[in-house]
């Protein structure tokens, strides 16, 4: 491949930045030849176009009076898309000069908002010219640009887009790619590539194994997504990490704990039900016992004369006093007195029991027969009198014991 310097012959009064546009890396040599200024570019550029010769009115040739050739329009869609193989190779091996491509595809006000921690981005150089000649536009890049736009439109129409762990951005992003760029995808990692040439771009590829499902392309702080494989291919499941295993163990432990708690609650419910049943049985037995005690107290109240008290302690006091009075009567009978003096009874006993006894209920004999004296009895000596008193005392004691037994049986039955 041969490189030829581009010769531009200009008049001394036509050298201006509007007529001739020089790149940043161009080296121009000004030569004076027959009252004309000749500029020679020392940069290596492919010899795709013939040199542009502009003649002024001050030249000595006869063609100076002719009209100046107009520069071709800057629109690239009028350029022929058919090129030869050698020209294609020359464009592919040309240094990366793509400022014109990015200047027309991107808005001038778009600023990079994406964090630049993973890849270093070079600042974009200032624009070189206000318009670009059609001869300097490589046709290969135009084809790559159109392919990229078609790819972007197809990826936007897809509904099933896998984000791959990269944060989503607004959908109005611009996809920039070239025919020679390739995006590698590795298993479990995320690779990024930086391409410079007017606008910095970052390509983010989520790692999904050799058969990745989606590719994320970030451009000047924006992202666009595209499918790199058929949607029918199954997504490979990543192996479980230590965090997932720990979460699974914790979940199983919680389930086991919940089951144990349910069993404990059921046992508590059964225990509480048993306790409630035992309490109910105890209440029933206590009620029955109280009923029996009330019945015995009623029977004892019937035995005591003129007993109008319902309190248990007072009723028991009356019973004790009544038994004592009976014992005193038995002692007097045994002594053989003619009649029991009223002074021997207590005041309350005499008031309570004596009138009641005189009405006929449990009525004792009106008087105790006075034993006759020995000299008055006919054929009866003092020994016989003592025996008679002893027998009377025994009968009285037996009666009292029987009555006491009956009272106790009624109280505890």
UniProtKB/Swiss-Prot annotation:
Cell location: Nucleus
GO cellular component: nucleus
PROSITE patterns: BHLH (PS50888)
Keyword Cell inner membrane set for record: no
Tissue distribution of the protein: Expressed constitutively in leaves, stems, and flowers.
Matches recorded under SMART domains: HLH (SM00353)
Highest taxon of the lineage: Eukaryota
Region (Disordered) residue spans: 40-75, 232-278, 391-413
Pfam families linked: HLH
A GO biological process held by the record: regulation of DNA-templated transcription
Phosphoserine sites (modified residues): 191
Assembly information from the UniProt record: Homodimer.
Protein name (database record): Transcription factor bHLH23
């Amino acid at each position: 491949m041969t490189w030829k310097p581009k010769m531009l012959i200009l008049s001394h009064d036509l050298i201006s930045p509007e007529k001739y546009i020089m790149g940043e890396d161009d080296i121009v040599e000004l030569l004076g030849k027959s009252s004309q200024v000749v500029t020679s570019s020392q940069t290596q550029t492919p010899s795709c176009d013939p040199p542009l010769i502009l003649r002024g009115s001050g030249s000595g040739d006869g063609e100076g009076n002719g009209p100046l050739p107009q520069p071709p329009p800057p629109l690239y869609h009028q350029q022929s898309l058919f090129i030869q193989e050698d020209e294609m190779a020359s464009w592919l091996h040309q240094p990366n000069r793509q400022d014109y491509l990015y200047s027309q595809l991107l808005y001038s006000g778009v600023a990079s908002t994406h964090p630049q921690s993973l890849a270093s981005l070079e600042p974009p150089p200032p624009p070189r010219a206000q318009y670009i000649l059609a001869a300097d536009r490589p046709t290969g890049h135009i084809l790559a640009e159109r392919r990229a736009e078609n790819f972007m439109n197809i990826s936007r129409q897809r509904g099933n887009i896998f984000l791959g762990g990269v944060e989503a951005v607004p959908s109005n992003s611009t996809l920039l790619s070239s025919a020679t760029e390739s995006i590698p995808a590795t298993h479990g990692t995320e690779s990024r590539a930086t391409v410079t040439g007017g606008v910095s771009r970052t390509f983010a590829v989520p790692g999904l194994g050799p058969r990745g499902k989606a590719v994320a392309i970030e451009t000047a702080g924006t992202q666009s997504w595209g499918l790199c494989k058929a949607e029918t291919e199954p997504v490979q499941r990543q192996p479980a990490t230590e965090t997932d295993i720990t979460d699974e163990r914790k979940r199983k432990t919680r389930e086991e704990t919940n089951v144990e708690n349910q069993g404990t609650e059921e046992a508590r419910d059964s225990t509480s039900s048993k306790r409630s049943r035992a309490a109910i049985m105890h209440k029933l037995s206590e009620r029955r016992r109280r009923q029996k005690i009330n019945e015995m107290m009623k029977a004892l109240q019937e035995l005591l004369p003129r007993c109008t008290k319902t309190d248990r302690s007072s009723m028991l006091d009356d019973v004790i006093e009544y038994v004592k009075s009976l014992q005193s009567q038995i002692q007097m009978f045994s002594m053989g007195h003619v009649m029991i003096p009223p002074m021997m009874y207590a005041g309350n006993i005499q008031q309570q029991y004596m009138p009641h006894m005189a009405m006929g209920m449990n009525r004792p004999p009106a008087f105790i027969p006075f034993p006759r004296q020995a000299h008055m009895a006919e054929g009866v000596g003092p020994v016989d009198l003592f025996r008679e008193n002893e027998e009377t005392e025994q009968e009285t004691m037996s009666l009292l014991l029987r009555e006491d037994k009956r009272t106790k049986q009624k109280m505890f039955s």
